[in-house]
Amino acid sequence: DLPQRIARAHAWFTPRSTGGAELVVQAIDALLCGLDRTPQLAALVDGESSRSGSWLSGRNIRTSPIQQLPWGISHVQQYLPLLPLAIEQIDLGGAELVISSSHLVAKGVLTAPDQLHLSYVHTPVRYAWDQMHAYLSRSALARSGFGPLIRWQLHALRQWDQLSAQRVDHLLANSR
């Protein structure tokens, strides 16, 4: 049986994020709502629930402290060093099932031992893994002298990415 109390975690809900990951989130949300299991939603930031006409209009979305930072909603990716810590601050207590939809940090949401965590991973954090060198070669910031700092941050992100994957009960990937 499908649990009554379900939470959904995604990296962010912003007007500019309308890719494949967001379409999957919408489809899973519609499926759960259709089964009379409207999930509690959580994200680093939410710029959608207050927008008229948005599929999230009127929904209560739990967010991280990034929501309150300057340009947190519009430029959430600029806070990359803080995102792993920020996703861990979102409290999903009370949910029996947590479904995360991850292309960056959502799978890192903390769950209790009595919660089942299912994570659908769209892609690895490619700019931290297999595309790191290409990413750094295109980054003006990396070429301006911050390269060593950015490399260290991407190294830390890879370590956290591996650790957070170990905390998930079931990991699903949409590719190899």
Predicted regions and their residues:
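Nucleotide-activated donor-dependent transferases that construct or modify glycoconjugates
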Residues: 2-18, 44-45
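Structural motif
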Residues: 5, 96-97, 116, 170
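Short amphipathic alpha-helix
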Residues: 21-32
